[in-house]
């Protein structure tokens, strides 16, 4: 019996070590990106993203906690606009600040998560005219510390976050094309 327990312990230790070593092979940075063509001009779409107060109309994260606390600060929109949120476990808590606003082509946002996991990333929106439409790209990128790499062994971040971006872009499309 003792020999069987020892064998199981060794197998578990090797398995855990294997997962940890595999996590170390993951990239040191990540990037998730989705794009969608919206049949609206960039100057009509841009304000819906540059003003955080409009995010309640299209962001997939806003509906996950109707009681979420929101604090808007800085400028009303564009560079310097800030947004802090504190909600349930589905949305966590964090802070965003628009660092770069190139009307109507690009927004770069500093994105700091406090809960459920601490993280410091960058979100970026680009708006590229294409005939009578605008290609909107929503991206998030940043460092991948060891805990993120370990999570990536079990969870595909691109799939998980990418689905949210797809839902958000589809909602933004409905709003912009009204």
Language-model regions: role of each:
Residues 6-72:
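Hydrophobic ligand-binding cavity/cleft-lining segments
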Residues 35-39, 84-86, 97, 108-110, ...:
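Generic structural detector for well-ordered beta-strands
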Residues 100, 110-166, 172-174:
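Beta-strand/loop substructures that line and gate deep hydrophobic ligand-binding cavities in soluble
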Residues 53-95, 104:
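Short beta-edge strand/loop motif at the mouth of beta-sheet-based domains
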Residues 31-33, 91-96, 118-124:
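Short, surface-exposed coil-to-beta transition loops
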Residues 49-59, 87, 165, 169, ...:
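Sec/Tat-exported extracytoplasmic proteins
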Residues 29, 80, 104-106, 131-135:
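A generic structural signal for beta-strand entry/edge sites
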Residues 26-28, 75, 88-90, 115-119, ...:
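A generic structural micro-feature
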